[in-house]
Amino acid sequence: IYRGILDTTAVIWMGEFGRTPTINGNGGRDHWARSWSAVVGGAGFTRGVVVGETSADGREVASEPYSSQDLMTSVLKSLDISLETTFRAKNGRPMKIANGGQVIPGLFS
């Protein structure tokens, strides 16, 4: 019954920020917005690819910097949702779902 479900279902694992590459004074890690990771699959995403990289110490993006808007635009493309789709905020203001992002080419073959 579930065979082929990933053809039309996108699976996304991510957080809203990364974590510092070093341990802080309390033995933990702090928020780190300069670099973060996401894992995507299904719905037309290419399998087994890595897009972009950080510096050796994990502090900065070393290649292929993308934004959260780019990731959202790529998810919308994978699900065949128009980038012109709008929704209404609580105050009634129309908002574009893609918000100006670009498709990340390395995620699709």
Segments (PLM) and residue ranges:
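Ligand-binding pockets and gating/stacking loops
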Residues: 1-109
